[in-house]
Amino acid sequence: MNPQVRNLSFALLLALLCFAAYAPVLNNGFIADDYVLLEWSDKLKQDFFFLFTVPPMNFRTTSIALYGLLKSVFGYRPEFFYAFNILLHFINAWLFSRLLLLTTRDKVVAFAGAAMFAVFQAPQEAVMWVTGMGETLQGLFVLCTLLAWLKRRYFWSAVFFFFALFSKESALMVLALVPMLQWQQRKKLFPPAYGILLMPVAIFVAVFLHTWSTNHFIQKNVYAIGPQAAMVMIRTLLRLVWPWLVVIVALFRIDLHRWPQARQFGAAIGAVTLTLLPYIFLTYSGYLPSRQVYTASMVFVWLLAWLYSQLRNPKLQMAFAAAFLTVNLSYLWFQKDRQFELRAAPTTELLKLLQSRPPTQILIFDFPYPEPDIPKDVSFLVPGWTRDLVGVHGTGESCTDCLILHWDAQTRTLVSR
């Protein structure tokens, strides 16, 4: 087959897989923090340095700027935001296939790895939540950084790395991923060109230290160095690799009558661990949210694809591929989409209520999201309504002559008292 036709066919297949995996999200509404970030995108247009007053959101500059661009084109239409995020995921899957091809020179590994990443449910929050777009953007810039590095375009590698760092702080993982690629290519771990990557890091560190005292995540102990990090790492790693690593290793053993090579296997697990490392200091959960394993999922399916490519029995390959596709697609369609609909329910119901009534003062009790800016910013989607008309009980706001609303957790609706 002509290489151009083959590449086009593969790209179309990847696009189909990405769409098949995440199409259910297209009819979902905005969720929670989405409303706040959409408002901040307007403030960013007016003042480029606004995000530096609410750190660490300055390290989300690329995604918030993108929200503003999408909003200026499509307005408050969530389906277009979700469609764009699915497009980003497709581009990342395609770039990931290029990275696999450059590093392994194996078309089976490149095809299988990219296809598995396209439908793998583990990082679904990065694609199924508009706020998670920071992770898909970071993934895009990290992939571009690594591809430029492998092609010896070191200046562009540093430029992409800079944008990755201002998509999410965790992009610092590049400093470890580049030496791992060098090791995989049997090259010097830290060549002279590595120094150019330290230039965007110097800017990042200067900004990070300058905003340390006002960084909400640090000052409120949302992230903190402590013993909990080890347990977060272990739990997240187990959740990420189960059950597919066990399945593919079992098939490998059955088919080849041996275990995978320890050196490559251990290096792959080590690389997965490194991509999780920047996130594990969170204190609000015993494991990482799914959006934060987006890049780690690439490394993990790289391992799966490497093991898959070595299977000699085509029936076992087909069985694994069919099971992987069916289970992940089913989980995304019938489990995760419903969960995101439920997460969106409070703001979706509030939006419907505002659309059905003329502007008036309201006070909401028991709204499930603790951040009062979330319900207030829903008002931007309805002409005539403003933030000051939406009060939230428990924030010191009160009124004597206003509509009182109560969130009913059982029916998931707003009811008037």
Language-model regions: role of each:
Residues M1-R417:
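Polytopic membrane enzymes that build or remodel cell-surface glycoconjugates and lipids
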